Amino acid sequence: MAGVSAVRWLGLRSRLGQPLTGRRAGLCKQARSCRFYSGSATLSKVEGTDITGIEEVVIPKKKTWDKVAVLQALASTVNRDTTSVPYVFQDDPYLIPASSLESRLFLLAKKSGENVAKFIINSYPKYFQKDIAEPHIPCLMPEYFEPQIKDISEAALKERIELRKVKASVDMFDQLLQAGTTVSLETTNSLLDLLCYFGDQEPSTDYHFQQTEQSEALEVENDETSRRKAGHQFGVTWQAKNNAERIFSLMPEKNAHSYCTMIRGMVKHRAYEQALNLYTELLNNRLHADVYTFNALTEATVCVINGKFEEKWSKIQELLRHMVAQKVKPNLQTFNTILKCLRRFHVFARSPALRILREMKAIGIEPSLATYHHIIHVFDQPGDPLKRSSFIIYDIMNELMGKRFSPKDPDDDKFFQSAMSICSSLRDLELAYQVHGLLNTGDNWKFIGPDHHRNFYYSKFFDLICLMEQIDVTLKWYEDLIPSVYFPHSQTLIHLLQALDVANRLEMIPKIWKDSKEYGHTFRSDLREEILKLMARDKHPPELQVAFADCAADIKSAYESQHIRQTAQDWPATSLYCIAILFLRAGRTQEAWNMLELFRKHNKIPRSELLNELMDSAKVSNSPSQAIEVVELASAFSLPICEGLTQRVMSDFAINQEQKEALGNLTALTSDSDTDSSSDSDSDTSEGK
């Protein structure tokens, strides 16, 4: 027991960090990096003997946690609320969007508010000097966009380059040359980087919230030019003899960086031929290009040559051989650029695309989602029903299942849209579930892309579920995805209605109509007509007929609320017929009879089925006046059923002499109109002969 006490005391003192003396201190020094344990509950050996079971303590390496690790841990403890809209919209309950259009307006307004706040902070920086954020958040503090160095020096030029002042940087460079000051090669290359990236034009206002008088004058000067362009970044073209070319020609010494910057700038702004010519000059000067320049040259090669596929593919292979000769190792973007270029040639590019994919794996480059996105487009055309699928999507999914991806290429967020589009074309629900499972693996959901990409993906996914899945599973997906993930399009709701029709679950129609109103589809005529047709097609139990009639009355109110847009075509005959039939079947007779006025008002011809049901309703209520009104409506449109309705009135109702005369006049008018129409047709036939 004394030995046990000694060992426990030593362990306690060593854990508490208390100093030891004498024999105990010596033992502790030897055992400071060791941990004692015994194979049994009691220690059989006394102090001073060998202690069995000594295990070396391995101190773990320091782990660097992400700044939002705590938030990520907390977020992992909760699930998505399927009854609410996406979290980005959960601000003011009165501002929560209810449709795709409103959600886009919400996001634009939110981004505009952020830009305005940033503009105010940068316009009045003296009022925002106190940093209250812990840790420091740079975007909450003012940014200084105006140069602080006023004299003419290379330091001033560097400052203007860092501030992305294109015109000011060029002016400072020219002033330095006029003063006889030699600008270093590094600074000149930085200036070329700025000019080539922005195409020798001032950046858009997204980069500068403060506009000085000089920049405003420059904006007015370039206004006419900018209007001819489709957009700032995508519309800028490379101008001949611009400042970049002028400064490049003035450089007394050029290195590989100078040439590579110019080549990439020319390709970025669609000066492909100039880029290829400059690459030839680079080779003549015995310089080597970097991998990013070769990536740009690959794009330029495909865009500039107006030849056949074999010629363009030969040029791409020649560039790859140049990379080998210059000992430039390709990266992921190299292969993705080649695959993106091969998409132009479809069937001809299938074999080269597979060779490129095998080469990637052979040199140890892991393909990204963008790689498989380009492969899909080489073998298939998502969304094109005329193209026969090559089924390569199955091989891709077998390779990707269970993997977690990180962003490596700007086109990574396009893979899931392409894959789900192929699933929709193939009508393969199991494959769609695999794609959706891959999306929900780890953080792959971040690659769903912007709002319109997400809507496209989930629309295709849910449409396929409506077409192929059982109705209970379909409704479960409906509750899970809408509106917590995306807002459905009216066509998506029509597909859901068709699924309900196939499964004989029409009792869900009133709920679908209620949801469609919340999602902003109240005035979608195709959706309203589909709902009315399904409700009016067959007879149902009384409780369901009452619910259908309420839904029909709500749809009727939606038609009537279209003040300016309401025209004759806004009230199709089918909708009028369905609403009247639903009112009759639910016992709302007066509302059904009121629908007859709408037929006359909008000049719509009622169906014979509706007239017969109206006649049955008049017979049940024993109302000869209503029966005669039905005959009058049929006579007004010269319907063939008018004579049969007249006979029903004569046989089924007790009418007076005045009503008999009215019926006789209606019958005579109908027969006269029939005679006139037949004579007109006979005369037309004789004239034709």
Curated annotation (Swiss-Prot):
Biased composition (Acidic residues): 673-689
Keywords: Acetylation, Mitochondrion, Repeat, Ribonucleoprotein, Ribosomal protein, RNA-binding, rRNA-binding, Transit peptide, Translation regulation
InterPro entries per record: Pentatricopeptide_rpt, PTCD3, Rib_mS39_PPR, TPR-like_helical_dom_sf
Subcellular location: Mitochondrion
Domain of life, per lineage: Eukaryota
PPR repeats: 149-183, 184-219, 255-289, 290-330, 331-367, 368-404, 412-446, 454-488, 489-523, 572-606
Region (Disordered): 665-689
GO cellular component annotations of the record: mitochondrion; ribonucleoprotein complex; ribosome
Entry-linked Pfam families: PPR_3 (PF13812), Rib_mS39_PPR (PF22330)
GO molecular function, one term: ribosomal small subunit binding
One GO BP: mitochondrial translation
Presequence positions on this chain: 1-37
Residues bearing PTM N6-acetyllysine: 126
Functional summary from the UniProt entry: Mitochondrial RNA-binding protein that has a role in mitochondrial translation.
Subunit structure, interactors included: Component of the mitochondrial ribosome small subunit (28S) which comprises a 12S rRNA and about 30 distinct proteins. Associated with the 12S mitochondrial rRNA (12S mt-rRNA).
Recorded family membership: Belongs to the mitochondrion-specific ribosomal protein mS39 family.
Protein name: Small ribosomal subunit protein mS39
Organism for this UniProt entry: Pongo abelii
